């Protein structure tokens, strides 16, 4: 009876993972050997604030969920923590920032963007891109620059006329 209950639990877990992986734009797999529970919980809290999921999943269950969701095939070995979400840049930044703080205990092993395998170097390059909010700020600055220069020019013209 207990084996049947365990099997049912695994089937439900795989179904839940499939639905979450299907919506994810990015999925990163990291080695977390030697990382304390407290530090892993800190990562989860940072991720939760950004809408990113963090979960330690058995490789066989993750493999089944990924395969049934259409992700490219990965050879999963050893202990892994899976991170996924809808924003590739935010997820990449989170992983590489956390990796810098915990070099010996947290390493990116594999990445999948839009269900296709990408190299660790690719994920690192994406982590260096500006976030959506930063890009919007840059764009807004570019759009307002002509008006700002026009107003500054008018103000300088007014000051020049007042001096004469």
UniProtKB/Swiss-Prot annotation:
The entry's cellular-component GO terms read: cytosolic large ribosomal subunit
- Explain the purpose of this protein: Forms part of the ribosomal stalk, playing a central role in the interaction of the ribosome with GTP-bound translation factors.
GO MF annotation, one: large ribosomal subunit rRNA binding
Q: Has keyword rRNA-binding?
A: yes
Kindly give the CDD domains that the UniProt entry links to this protein. Answer: Ribosomal_L10
**Coiled coil residues, start to end:** none
The similarity annotation says: Belongs to the universal ribosomal protein uL10 family.
Which InterPro entries does this one have? Ribosomal_uL10, Ribosomal_uL10-like_sf, Ribosomal_uL10_bac, Ribosomal_uL10_bac_type, Ribosomal_uL10_CS_bac
UniProt entry keywords in alphabetical sequence? Ribonucleoprotein, Ribosomal protein, RNA-binding, rRNA-binding
- What's the protein name? Large ribosomal subunit protein uL10
> Does the record's keyword annotation contain rRNA-binding?
yes
**Xref: Pfam families:** Ribosomal_L10
Which NCBIfam families did the record assign?
PRK00099.1-1
Assembly, per entry: Part of the ribosomal stalk of the 50S ribosomal subunit. The N-terminus interacts with L11 and the large rRNA to form the base of the stalk. The C-terminus forms an elongated spine to which L12 dimers bind in a sequential fashion forming a multimeric L10(L12)X complex.
- HAMAP family, from UniProt? Ribosomal_uL10 (MF_00362)
Question: Any one Gene Ontology biological process term?
Answer: translation
